[in-house]
């Protein structure tokens, strides 16, 4: 019997994600509660160091629109903008065809990614510097001006774009005891004084003031947006800014030089690395765009080389090289770690290791926010290109299914999206217009895979007709099915084997027997007599309870009566669902008697089983008693036909005209559902002419109390029971009081 039960209720097909946490509901809340918030040495919360609202300057840090409205003079708990997003820090590594090795060679046509074994979530605040007078922070004292390269724009001759790691000025950090002194490492070109370590204001596009409530409540369990913000942090955590520690290709990007704080470096602050500039509640930092997506604004075109690494998924254009480059979204998910990205409506799901993470209302975020739609943030800059996912990324989704291993798989088709992009670009060009077929057809695939390509993999060739064609073999132009990982396969097979009913059922049975050993029977000869006695007691209790309930149960009306449970007679049972239920209950009652006999006789007649079966039988007989009483009451009524000029009677309590009070509402006859608007329902009405009641607007009520108005209820008072079948036909029956 146990084998049969296990075979019925346990499916041998398991989901891949049963190996990890179930992130649904409260479990996700628990996970978020323990996310290690790192930033400026403070937890992310009310103890975060903010600014004084009263004394904050109009362009002070933490506000782009002026001072806060708080007039209490207390310290504000608004986070600095870089504390809003979620980032991470790890050693920078290169990707070699899906396997990861530290990037130390001279010829490196790969793009830096992160070491998945050394990942830590952070709030992106590592480079956000408090005022130097605070002398409390020891994290990455790089000025905002240096970090963004803002001092090198506008005709600068340094040769580097804003945010280029080569162009960053290193902060000079001095530590005396527990006090830190930070200052810019190089003087400004037009001044002999060094730049201040703090910045005066934040760029407007980096200060999502309107999103501060969500940001502040990110760790609040009652915030409905916390899961959405968490996913934005995961997908929007841009890879760490590469610390280009050397002067040539032979010693750049060394993992040993990827340092993150003064604590790590102690004395050698020249190698201080900046954690990823991070995203601001989903917003990309333009300095990061310039650094990782090539010299987009400074040079007007993207380039991906070891000296100017580009990490992104740019829309391929036919007038430049090295365009199709995959975005590695902070978490360096290897093919076996992430896959099966599924989009349905506005929900997004993806596999992360053994987890299936699902979030809603994420596919179509606000313009400029990270998500499936990545666009340039600086709308005023004509050279700021859109980053793929294209305009409507959800249009590329073709569906998903569950394979034999229980994994969710999905199909994407970007051909149409890419052709639209190529067609638009071709029409804007001065050369012959391309048809859009020049781009290769992109095969359907299941997930994204971080891969590698040389910058020359994408080439453009001009045909004799002058039409430009794409000759591209770059794997970045395709969505690649994840590689099969042997360990994962073995894990799936092991779980499947473990949960096979033929193996699971005997194990459970054995464990059950070992857990509950049988009690010895000192006198087996008397055991049947003891069981028979208990059977008699059980049956007697059940019968007494059922009979008493049947005799005392009044007629039970619902408001409105439920789909044929009451009304009309069919033998001794109500018509419709009620009759079926009564018959089912009678069968169940018989089965209960049989089961209690078997249970008591063969299972040692435990006290727990005795109580359980007694309660079950009593409950079953109670329900049967209700229906029997209802049927008996209806049979006493005298049925006849009446005119169709009634008012609707809506009950607010149990109805029995002879025993209990009732209330009906005067309603216009025309409002009754005579045309099948409510098929299968019952309507109990009262004759409109018997008591001289005028059909009202539905706001009047008349209450009948049998203890006071019995005499007023004459034989002329007629109650009508109307039923509407599925075809809209009306069956009317009446009875007099």
Swiss-Prot record:
Pfam families per UniProt: Adhesin_P1_C (PF03257)
Annotated Basic and acidic residues bias: 128-142
Biased composition (Polar residues): 175-198
Biased composition (Low complexity): 59-76, 461-474
Composition bias type Gly residues, residue spans: 151-162
InterPro entries membership: Adhesin_P1_C (IPR004940)
Positions of the UniProt region annotated as Disordered: 47-76, 93-116, 128-214, 457-476
Family of the protein in this entry: Belongs to the adhesin P1 family.
Record protein name field: Putative adhesin P1-like protein MPN_370
Naturally occurring in which organism (per UniProt): Mycoplasma pneumoniae (strain ATCC 29342 / M129 / Subtype 1)
């Amino acid at each position: 019997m146990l084998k049969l039960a296990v075979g019925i209720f346990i499916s041998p097909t398991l989901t891949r994600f049963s190996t990890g946490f179930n992130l649904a509901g409260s479990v996700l809340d628990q996970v978020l509660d323990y996310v290690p918030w790192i930033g400026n040495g403070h937890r992310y919360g009310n103890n975060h160091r903010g600014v004084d609202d009263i004394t904050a300057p109009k362009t002070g840090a933490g506000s782009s629109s002026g001072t806060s409205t708080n007039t209490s003079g207390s310290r504000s708990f608004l986070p600095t903008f870089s504390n809003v997003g979620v980032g991470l820090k790890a050693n920078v590594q290169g990707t070699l065809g899906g396997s990861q090795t530290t990037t130390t060679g001279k010829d490196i046509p790969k793009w830096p990614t992160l070491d998945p074994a050394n990942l830590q979530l952070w709030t992106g605040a590592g480079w956000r510097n408090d005022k130097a007078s605070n002398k409390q922070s020891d994290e990455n004292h790089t000025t905002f001006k240096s970090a963004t390269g803002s001092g090198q724009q506008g005709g600068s001759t340094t040769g580097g774009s804003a945010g280029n790691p080569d162009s960053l000025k290193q902060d000079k950090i001095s530590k005396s005891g527990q006090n830190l002194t930070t200052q810019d490492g190089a003087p400004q070109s037009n001044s002999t004084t060094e730049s201040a370590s703090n910045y005066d204001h934040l760029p407007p596009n980096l200060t999502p003031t309107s999103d501060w409530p969500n940001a502040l409540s990110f760790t609040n369990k009652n915030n409905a947006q916390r899961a959405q913000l968490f996913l934005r942090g995961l997908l929007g955590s841009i890879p760490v800014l590469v610390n280009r520690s050397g002067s040539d290709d032979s010693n750049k990007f060394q993992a040993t030089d990827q340092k993150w704080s003064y604590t790590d470096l102690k004395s050698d602050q020249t190698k201080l690395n900046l954690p990823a500039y991070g995203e601001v509640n989903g917003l990309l930092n333009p300095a990061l765009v310039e650094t990782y997506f090539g010299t987009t604004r400074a040079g007007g075109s993207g380039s991906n080389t070891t000296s100017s690494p580009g990490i992104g998924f740019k829309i391929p254009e036919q007038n430049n090289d090295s365009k199709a480059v995959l975005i590695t979204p902070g978490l360096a998910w290897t093919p076996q770690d992430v896959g099966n990205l599924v989009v349905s409506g506005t929900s997004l799901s993806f596999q992360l290791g053994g987890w299936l993470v699902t979030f809603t209302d994420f596919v179509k975020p606000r313009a400029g926010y990270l998500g499936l739609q990545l666009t340039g943030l600086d709308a005023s800059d004509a050279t700021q290109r859109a980053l793929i996912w294209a305009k409507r990324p959800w249009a590329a989704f073709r569906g998903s299914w569950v394979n034999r291993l229980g994994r969710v798989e999905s199909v994407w088709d970007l051909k149409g999206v890419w052709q639209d992009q190529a067609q638009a670009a071709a029409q804007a060009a001065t050369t012959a217009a391309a048809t859009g077929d020049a781009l290769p057809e992109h095969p359907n695939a299941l997930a994204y895979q971080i891969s590698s390509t040389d910058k020359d993999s994408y080439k453009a060739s001009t045909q004799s007709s002058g039409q430009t064609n794409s000759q591209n073999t770059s794997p970045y132009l395709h969505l690649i099915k994840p590689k099969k990982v042997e360990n994962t396969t073995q894990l799936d097979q092991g779980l499947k084997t473990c949960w096979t009913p033929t193996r699971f059922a005997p194990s459970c049975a054995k464990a059950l027997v070992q857990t509950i050993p049988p009690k010895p029977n000192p006198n087996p000869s008397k055991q049947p007599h003891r069981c028979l006695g208990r059977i008699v007691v059980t049956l007697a209790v059940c019968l007494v309870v059922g009979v008493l309930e049947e005799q005392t149960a009044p007629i039970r009306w619902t408001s409105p009566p439920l789909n044929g449970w009451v009304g009309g007679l069919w033998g001794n049972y109500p018509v419709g669902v009620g009759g079926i239920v009564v018959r089912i209950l009678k069968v169940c009652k018989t089965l209960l008697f049989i089961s209690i006999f078997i249970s008591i006789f063969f299972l040692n007649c435990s006290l727990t089983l005795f109580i359980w079966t007694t309660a079950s039988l009593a409950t079953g007989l109670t329900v049967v008693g209700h229906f029997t009483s209802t049927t008996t009451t209806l049979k006493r009524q005298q049925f006849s036909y009446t005119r169709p000029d009634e008012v609707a009677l809506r009950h607010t309590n149990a109805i029995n005209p002879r025993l209990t009070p009732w209330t009906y509402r005067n309603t216009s006859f025309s409002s009754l559902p005579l045309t099948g608007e409510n098929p299968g329902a019952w309507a109990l009405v009262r004759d409109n002419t018997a008591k001289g009641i005028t059909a009202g607007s539905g706001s009047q009520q008349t209450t009948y109390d049998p203890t006071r108005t019995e005499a007023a209820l004459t034989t002329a008072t007629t109650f009508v029971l109307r039923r509407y079948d599925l075809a809209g036909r009306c069956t009317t029956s009446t009875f007099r009081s």
